[in-house]
């Protein structure tokens, strides 16, 4: 198993009377993923950081990865999964969105944190609720302009974060913690059920009005300011003053470096279109690729030190809370026959899910047509955002993608990391956001992309 030194900087978050009221402890441990965390008072140059320059591109994945392709019958069918890392890119610590619909903000900011690690060797933690506040005001404005037909909800896409970065900048979490209430450690995590109901009620009250006042946005902003805190116009970070825009500039991030990719047949390949899902309300123009080429982009990115923001559907039976995402061939009834098959047919869906995900089993072979059918009949929805950062293999040599979730480090059997099979990635990927330089050259040419 690959041995990788990981630096955890565990912050004890105090009552936010100061932007920098935190302490740090440094712990060196061994893990499958390179996880690096830092408080705003301390700059850490990680001992292991991917090269700033991409490696030589190849049109196919690494030879090691190619050998692991395919879906052979599992040789080791003992209970559980055992994973060995093949390749991984440095990431920051797993965060917890808790009871909020803000996975899109957490996952894409994690992606940008890895970008800063890649280019600067610097650890930073962005403020998700700054992005949420800015985005929800924009979404409310859109809903009102569309006469409230679109659903006003807390969901969003990776592009919302990139749009925010370009137009409003970003801030470190210490400048806007995003929690203004709570009496215990558990209460210091986002709980947005009340906020969502209040803001939906506010927007809903506008419906049917003959004329809107010019201050309705100010009223809505006051609600978000009350629950999340005001978005800072200026702040201090590591002894220097910044605006949200100058902070982004200091980190070398450029919104124009990032593009969204998808793979569906109801629009021409190698052209752009706005994927028709509710959370793409900004109508982000995504580049459309055949699924095989989209998978090549993912593999090439990881091989060259890039991560990806991943928009996916996790409602499938093979996506578990234990940290696994697979597409088991349920039609085979877990390879049962006779009386065992009869028992299988009589199982509840929860029990079937347990049986199909407790050990490596054969998976469905996913085609472009299967992807499209699942999208067209609403089996594939845009319900979750995560960060792809590595590859691994199980005890039988089958290949998986390592994905950072935002459900806290106590979720899953792998400290907040999920292992997603190639079949699941092919089937349930809605879109990915990636740096243009991470795309293989031949695909960039087809998309007519220029890079710096």
Task: Enumerate the language-model features and the residues they cover.
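Bacterial Sec-dependent N-terminal signal peptides
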Residues: 1-24, 63-66
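Active-site signature of cysteine proteases
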Residues: 218-452
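N-terminal regions that are enriched for targeting/export leaders
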Residues: 26-50, 69-89, 93
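Transition segments tied to proteolytic processing and entry into folded domains
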Residues: 34, 63, 373-376
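Active-site nucleophile-adjacent alpha helix/oxyanion-hole segment immediately C-terminal to the catalytic cysteine
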Residues: 83-252, 259-268, 273-280, 285-308, ...
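Terminal-region recognition feature
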Residues: 23-27, 389
């Amino acid at each position: 198993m690959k041995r990788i030194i990981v630096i955890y900087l565990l912050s004890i978050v105090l009552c936010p009377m100061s932007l920098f009221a935190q302490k740090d402890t440094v712990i060196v441990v061994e893990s499958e993923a390179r996880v690096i965390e830092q408080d705003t008072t301390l700059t850490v140059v990680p001992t292991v950081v991917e090269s700033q320059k991409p490696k030589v591109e190849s049109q196919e994945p690494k030879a090691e990865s190619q050998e692991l392709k395919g879906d052979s019958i599992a040789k080791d069918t003992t209970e559980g999964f055992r994973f060995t890392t093949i390749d991984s890119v440095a990431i920051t610590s797993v965060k917890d969105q808790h009871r909020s619909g803000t996975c899109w903000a957490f996952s894409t900011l994690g992606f940008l944190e890895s970008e800063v690690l890649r280019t600067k060797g610097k650890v930073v933690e962005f403020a998700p609720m700054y992005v949420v506040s800015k985005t929800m005001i924009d979404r409310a404005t859109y809903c009102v302009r569309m006469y409230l037909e679109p659903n006003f909800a807390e969901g969003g896409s990776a592009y919302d974060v990139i749009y925010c970065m370009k137009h409003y900048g970003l801030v470190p979490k210490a400048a806007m913690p995003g929690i203004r209430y709570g009496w215990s450690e558990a209460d210091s995590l986002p709980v947005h059920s009340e906020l969502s109901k209040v803001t939906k009620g506010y927007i809903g009250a506008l419906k049917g009005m003959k004329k809107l006042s010019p201050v309705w946005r100010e009223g809505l902003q006051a609600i978000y300011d009350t629950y999340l805190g005001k978005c800072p116009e200026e702040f201090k970070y590591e002894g220097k003053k910044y605006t949200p825009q100058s902070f982004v500039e200091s980190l070398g991030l450029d919104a124009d470096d990032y593009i969204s990719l998808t793979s569906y047949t109801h629009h021409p390949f190698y052209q752009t279109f706005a994927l028709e899902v509710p959370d793409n309300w900004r109508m982000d123009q995504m580049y459309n690729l055949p699924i095989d080429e989209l998978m090549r982009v993912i593999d090439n990115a990881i091989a060259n030190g890039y991560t990806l923001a991943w928009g996916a559907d996790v409602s499938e039976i093979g996506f578990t809370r234990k940290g696994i995402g697979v597409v088991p061939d349920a039609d085979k009834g877990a390879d049962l026959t006779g009386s065992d098959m009869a028992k299988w047919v009589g199982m509840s869906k929860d029990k079937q899910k347990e049986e199909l995900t407790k050990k490596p089993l054969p998976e469905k072979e996913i085609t472009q047509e299967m992807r499209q059918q699942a999208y067209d009949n609403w089996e594939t929805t845009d319900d979750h955002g995560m960060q792809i950062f590595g590859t691994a293999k199980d005890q039988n040599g089958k290949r998986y993608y390592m994905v950072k979730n935002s459900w806290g480090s106590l979720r899953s059997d792998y400290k907040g990391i999920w292992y997603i099979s190639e079949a699941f990635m092919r089937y349930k990927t809605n879109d990915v956001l990636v740096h243009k330089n991470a795309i293989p050259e031949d695909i960039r040419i087809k998309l007519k992309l220029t890079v710096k």
